[in-house]
Regions:
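Transit-peptide-like, low-complexity N-terminal presequences
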Residues: 9-29
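Small-residue-rich segments of transmembrane alpha-helices in multi-pass membrane proteins
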Residues: 40-49, 160-173, 220-223
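Arg/Gly-rich low-complexity intrinsically disordered repeat tracts
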Residues: 1-11
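Membrane interfacial helix-start motif at the N-side
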Residues: 25-38, 104, 150, 216-226
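Intramembrane alpha-helical segments
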Residues: 28-29, 68, 76, 98-181, ...
Length: 226
């Protein structure tokens, strides 16, 4: 697979569609909070875990921490992904209007937003028990490095699925203070669920990814012999 080529972005593709948009609204788009359904990919499995581990009756404060934690974590993932791909996204129809790709926000602002989001997630992690806290720490490098996987790994969506699967491990252990066989079964189901969801999502970028020279599970399934 050839290395990703990153030519100078076409000005016609990087002109913002929202030139008068307030900075706050641009940051909301950077965080993907204008598309809340995407946050559910991480939140739903995490809530599965906390409710199953607590036999349907988890402490409400813990549920709140899990919900806020998934929002903060998904925000980190989205911003870091856009920072990695700021020179690739302008070449993709679906992503060319993202704030960093369209230059509606600077890289410096993107880094600040990523750090603030990560700090918010860290503050919430301190509420958890030691096992859950260290699982949070272990998830960070996977989340930060996932966007680079599409440059070297044929199925980068699997890396994202593993990263989001940490939500199950963290939530379950936050209730039980351990990880048991059912935890791993739920984790495996979550990885497969996320992989399937994100592969369908990647189908719309398949031709752009092939042209640019980046990997995706959508392309992998096309070239994989049956």
């Amino acid at each position: 697979m050839p290395h990703a080529q990153c030519p100078m972005p076409n000005p016609m593709l990087t002109t913002p569609k929202h030139p008068q948009e307030p900075v706050l609204f641009v940051i909301i788009r950077l965080l993907r909070w204008h598309k809340p359904e995407g946050r559910l990919i991480l939140m739903i499995p995490a809530l599965w875990a906390v409710f199953l581990a607590a036999s349907g009756k988890p402490p409400l404060p813990l549920v709140g921490v899990i919900i806020l934690g998934t929002l903060a974590t998904s925000a980190v993932g989205c911003v870091v992904n856009d920072l990695w791909d700021r020179d690739i996204d302008p070449q993709v129809e679906r992503t060319r209007d993202r704030p960093l790709a369209s230059r509606a926000l600077s890289v410096k602002v993107g880094i600040v937003v990523a750090i603030v989001s990560l700090l918010c997630a860290a503050v919430l992690a301190f509420y958890l028990n030691p096992l859950s806290f260290w699982l949070c720490v272990a998830a960070v490098p996977v989340i930060l490095l996932y966007p680079g996987a599409k440059r070297v790994f044929p199925v980068p969506q699997l890396v994202l699925s593993i990263a989001w699967g940490f939500g199950v491990l963290i939530s379950w252990s936050a209730v039980t203070q351990n990880i048991s066989q059912p935890t791993w079964l739920l984790w495996g189901a979550t990885v497969l669920w996320t992989l399937g969801f994100d592969t369908v999502y990647a189908m719309s970028d398949k031709e752009d990814d092939r042209r640019i020279g980046v990997n995706s599970s959508a392309l992998f399934l096309v070239i994989m012999p049956l």
